[in-house]
A protein has these predicted regions:
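Structured interface patches
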Residues: 1-171
Length: 171
């Protein structure tokens, strides 16, 4: 069972230069709003693998890995969708290393694990949440699910610009 945490004190590991540790921690991820619709993360409290390595100069190399499903309606057909999303994020935090080597998730030796996990998950979200890659969506005329009836079709509506010609009777 993973320890529950939203932040983690890196100094309490007492790592010497070049030493590393792998930890499994539980982090809560709040639901996401995506294109105006709320999507839940399943499970809401996920086990993450955190690799921490102490760099030779005062700093840390961090790696965060986990997988979780994004649960909500398919953006094409509105059926349930739950694509699994794998996250593999890396950060470096080195004192005096400038902006490039300073992680926004490490403040005073404290790693904001919940915010890093949320941001890393958000960066790996797909452009569209779909139930399956070949989802056909809904019929634009009647709203029928085209996955259930792939041969679904409607008679083409006549062009209204030619309506008066239909009234013309040639005998």
């Amino acid at each position: 069972m993973a320890a529950r945490t939203d932040s983690f004190d890196l100094a309490k590991l007492n790592l010497s230069s070049g030493e590393g540790r792998r930890l499994t921690l539980a982090v809560a991820l709040d639901p996401f709003e995506f294109a105006g619709t709320e999507y839940a993360v399943d499970p809401a409290r996920i086990d993450v693998t955190l690799d921490i390595s102490r760099m030779t100069h005062d700093g840390y190399a961090l790696r965060l890995r986990f997988a979780a499903a994004l649960v909500g309606p398919c953006m094409r057909c509105l059926e349930d969708a739950a694509p699994s999303i794998d996250v593999d994020a890396r950060e470096v935090d080195q004192a005096g290393g400038g902006e490039e080597l300073s992680s926004p998730y490490v403040q005073g030796g404290e790693l904001d694990l919940a915010q890093w996990a949320r941001d890393a998950y958000a960066l790996t979200l797909p452009n569209q949440v779909v139930c399956r890659a070949d989802c056909a969506g809904l019929c634009p005329v009647c709203g029928a699910n085209l996955n259930d009836d792939p041969g679904h079709a409607h008679e083409r509506a006549p062009d209204p610009r030619w309506a008066k010609l239909r009234e013309l009777r040639l005998e």
